[in-house]
């Protein structure tokens, strides 16, 4: 067997087949701003430091300052994902929907994370059903235009995407919706991230790598250094053939630059099988 594997590798190269492409590592643009504030430097300087670490892309918001987008592009950041906060619990949202679509078309992003807002206190089953219908209708519009639209497990009980059951209800209604798999939010909802991965694997189009201190401490720590099975999840993703983006998420960090370096090193080591 040891002799066969190198021969097989040579045959693949001779036939022009390249090794499977691995996922790329990205970060939230919000985190770049946090670095700028904490280090007392400009957004451009902070973005350059993050790029120097090795991050290849940035998740940005559809209302992001165009100057910031140009800076990211000039430094070589890839367009990992756009994020649209649209409050469907408050009713129809034509203006924000139009803004999200215009952003994708103008700036060349092909993936959209739809953060669906929080349902008002006291909302009824009928209210939730109506909000889901609005989400499904917009998802179909986005897909029809050739973009990927996704929702994520969101760490607030008032979200329609709070847990596996909530996501199930949305996915049953909308075949157009993909999933941004947030590694750290299923624990917040009392669900098992590995069970959720197996359940929603075919929907996953983007990943947020969020780690937590412990099951009873939801503070974020650099991916790969907390209680979330980051290595196992990333291993499953790679084995499945996923070669999209892994976006590091660590809101609340008091040392964002150092934590960004640690997270990048951890995830890189996982991808290398170390």
PLM features per residue range, with description:
Residues 24-26, 57, 78-81, 110-113, ...:
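Structural preference for beta-strand elements that scaffold enzyme active sites
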Residues 34-40, 57-69, 86-95, 120-123, ...:
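Acidic-and-aromatic substrate-binding clefts and catalytic sites of carbohydrate-active enzymes
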Residues 144-227:
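Acidic/histidine-rich catalytic cores of soluble enzymes
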Residues 104-124, 145-155, 247-248:
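Active-site groove signature of glycoside hydrolases
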Residues 15-106, 110, 178, 265-274:
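N-terminal pre-domain/capping segments
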Residues 27-31, 60-62, 81-86, 114-116, ...:
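A cross-domain feature marking catalytic cores of carbohydrate-active enzymes
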Residues 50, 58, 104, 149, ...:
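Conserved, mostly hydrophobic/aromatic
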Residues 4-13:
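Sec-dependent N-terminal signal peptides
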